[in-house]
Amino acid sequence: MASTVSAYKEKMKELSVLSLICSCFYSQPHPNTIYQYGDMEVKQLDKRASGQSFEVILKSPSDLSPESPVLSSPPKRKDASLEELQKRLEAAEERRKTQEAQVLKQLAERREHEREVLHKALEENNNFSPLAEEKLNYKMELSKEIREAHLAALRERLREKELHAAEVRRNKEQREEMSG
């Protein structure tokens, strides 16, 4: 049984799909049988112990006979009445107008946004000069105050040193007078 299954598997590997299908339907194929599938012919050459051999013949587009199935075209629509055509034209015109209005609305919104941005930029530019001048004046005043405070502190230290030096001189003179 196992040898039969393995032999069957080997046979299946050798057979083409087409011969497999044909052998399922026709156990004994007729000699030199020609099968037609659309624009190709399959001709059985001979049957061997190892399998079957076939010749596949493709027809050129010019050889296609009128008997072969033609690609089906979509079914023709019935003739539309004048009223239907008029309704379609009106609907198309309405869609076009709606689309055009929508595009114009978007353009108007874009222009309005551009105007707002430009106006804001001009406003900031006009406000920038006074603000910059104000900041500069503030910084100058602040640095002037800091400088004056620093100079006042230096003067105070210098005055204290002079007072200390005068006291030291006085003490020295008093010692000299006492000792001398």
Curated annotation (Swiss-Prot):
* PTM description: N-terminal palmitoylation promotes specific anchoring to the cytosolic leaflet of Golgi membranes and subsequent vesicular trafficking along dendrites and axons. Neuronal Stathmins are substrates for palmitoyltransferases ZDHHC3, ZDHHC7 and ZDHHC15.
Q: Coiled-coil ranges per the record? A: 75-179
Query: Could you tell me which residues are lipidated, with the kind given as S-palmitoyl cysteine?
Result: 22, 24
Q: Does the keyword Phosphoprotein apply?
A: yes
What do the Gene Ontology cellular component annotations say? cytoplasm; cytosol; Golgi apparatus; growth cone; neuron projection; perinuclear region of cytoplasm
Query: What tissues harbor this protein?
Result: Neuron specific.
Keywords linked to the UniProt accession = Cell projection, Coiled coil, Cytoplasm, Golgi apparatus, Lipoprotein, Palmitate, Phosphoprotein
Assign the protein's first listed, main location to one coarse class.
Answer: Golgi
Q: Does the keyword Cytoplasm apply?
A: yes
Where is the SLD domain positioned along the sequence?
38-180
Q: Which GO terms describe its molecular function?
A: protein domain specific binding; protein-folding chaperone binding; tubulin binding
As for subcellular location, the record says: Golgi apparatus; Cell projection, Growth cone; Cell projection, Axon; Cytoplasm, Cytosol
| UniProt GO BP | blastocyst hatching; cellular response to nerve growth factor stimulus; cytoplasmic microtubule organization; microtubule depolymerization; negative regulation of MAPK cascade; negative regulation of neuron projection development; negative regulation of Rac protein signal transduction; neuron projection development
Residue numbers carrying Phosphoserine: 50, 60, 65, 68, 72-73, 81
Name a Pfam family for this protein: Stathmin
Q: Where is this region: Disordered?
A: 58-81
What ranges does the record list as Low complexity composition bias?
Answer: 60-74
As for what it does, the entry says: Exhibits microtubule-destabilizing activity, which is antagonized by STAT3.
Q: How would you summarize the oligomeric state and partners of this protein?
A: Interacts with STAT3. Interacts with CLU (secreted form); this interaction may act as an important modulator during neuronal differentiation.
Entry similarity comment: Belongs to the stathmin family.
Q: What is this protein called?
A: Stathmin-3
Q: Which gene encodes it?
A: Stmn3
